[in-house]
A protein has these predicted regions:
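Residue-level recognition of beta-strand->loop/alpha-helix junctions
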Residues: 43, 133, 292-294
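Short beta-strand segments
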Residues: 69-71, 132-134, 162-166, 190-192, ...
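Acidic/histidine-rich catalytic neighborhood of metal-dependent amide-processing enzymes
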Residues: 105-180
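Glycine/serine-rich anion-binding loops at beta->alpha junctions
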Residues: 95-111, 197
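Acidic/His- and Gly-rich active-site-bordering loop/insert found
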Residues: 1-98, 121-126
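Acyl-CoA/ACP chain-elongation machinery
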Residues: 90, 136, 196
Length: 386
């Protein structure tokens, strides 16, 4: 049997701080090639962005096709001297594996790799199993999963269902399965006035006043009341600034940044219209500009045979899974355009923290859940796949 702990240790020992590959995908590639997978390494780049390593590995052919998606890049470890165990040593202590990426999400990659190696050791699947792994999830997410999906489609790959190994669990492995995510829309609102002395406000035009009124217009009334699957959409102002450090100067310009996490009652286009309508009414003639960042759309994988199969695989481990759409975004936001997708991974309590770790028992539990999914998947979807 494949040793999930050894695989996780090997991955953690690769210093793959985003966007560096650090040897993690090279290790995974060698591991899967030895098991009979066809492995393709792809690098993508774009102006002003770092070049990123990506990996696609596949065994079997035809349909149904189950894809596991994940990322080998990790966030920086911070002050390494603050760690009780070095962040890239993969040390084990008190029944836990320590290291950057243990929870998010090298542990889950190791679990699916171990499950897939055990499953395919008995013969190729009646369909296909693949890995879609990027080094650009913790970064801008421009040269990673999105482009790898485009590349896979161009070569004729068709995915039927996907699992993303993000750390979704709250207390016990498998207790939470993400079947959707809220969309995310960020923007910068700039309001223009006229600089002047605070003692002579009649000679100036303070942009802070209309800015405050416009922010109140965005926040005082909810965008919706939520849905059965999603909590209500929410806007948070994240910064307000004028570039002015003096107490006696009225600034010429004031800016605010905000983010909206929105449910499936909206898409980014409809939400922009609502935002702009509120701002126009509150501005009362003030000059302003609104600049958006690239949005992420919301999505929902509705309950059906695939979600039920994943829920039953978790139940076999003695855990009742809750279906959730809470939390932040993941690369599932790209995959949902190709096939139904769920997020299922380890407990994420220590992700991105000093001394990030995962219990060894949790790695074993997740491996067993993934293996059950593989064991049931091809019989369940062999007829329904087209």
């Amino acid at each position: 049997m494949a040793n999930v702990v050894e695989i996780a240790q090997a991955l953690i020992r690769c210093r793959s701080v985003t966007p560096a590959e650090g040897g993690a995908q090279r290790y995974l590639s060698d591991l899967l090639i030895r098991a009979g997978f066809d492995v393709q390494r792809q690098k993508f780049s774009s102006p002003g962005m770092p070049e990123v390593d990506n990996l696609f590995a596949k065994i079997g052919a035809g349909r149904p096709h189950l894809v596991f998606a994940g990322h080998t890049d990790v966030v920086p470890p911070g002050n390494e001297s603050s760690w009780c165990h070095p962040p890239f040593a993969g040390e084990i202590a008190d029944g836990k594996l320590f290291g950057r990426g243990a929870a998010d999400m090298k542990g889950a990659i190791a679990a699916f790799a171990a499950a897939a190696l055990d499953f395919t050791a008995r013969g190729k699947p009646r369909g296909a199993v693949s890995f879609l792994v990027t080094g650009d999830e913790e970064g801008p997410a421009v040269n990673g999963t999105l482009k790898l999906l485009h590349w896979a489609k161009a070569r004729g790959e068709k995915f039927d269902h996907a699992i993303v190994g993000e750390p979704t669990s709250v207390k016990r492995v498998g207790d939470t399965i993400k079947i959707g995510r809220r969309g995310s829309l960020s923007a910068t609102l700039s309001v223009f006035g006229k600089q002047g002395h605070v003692a002579y406000p009649d000679r100036a035009q303070n942009p802070m006043r209309p800015l405050i009124a416009m922010l109140e217009a965005l926040t005082e009334k909810p965008f919706d009341s939520g849905t059965k699957e999603f909590q209500r959409s929410n806007l948070e102002v994240t910064s307000v600034e004028s570039g002015n450090s003096a107490f006696n100067v009225i600034p010429a310009e004031a800016k605010a940044r905000f983010n909206v996490r929105f449910n499936d009652k909206h898409n980014s286009a409809s939400l922009k219209k609502t935002i702009e309508k509120r701002l126009k009414a509150a501005a009362k003639g003030a000059r302003y500009r609104l600049d958006y960042e690239p949005p992420s759309e919301s999505y929902l994988t509705r309950r059906g045979p695939f979600v039920d199969l994943v829920v039953k695989a978790v139940a076999a481990s003695g855990v009742k899974a809750a279906l959730s759409t809470s939390g932040g975004t993941s690369d599932a936001r790209f995959i949902k355009n190709y096939c139904p997708v769920v997020d299922l991974g380890l407990v994420g309590n220590t992700m991105h923290q000093i001394d990030e770790h995962v219990p060894l028992e949790d790695l074993q539990r997740l491996t067993k859940i993934y293996r059950r999914i593989l064991e049931k998947y091809f019989a369940a979807f062999a007829v329904s796949a087209r």
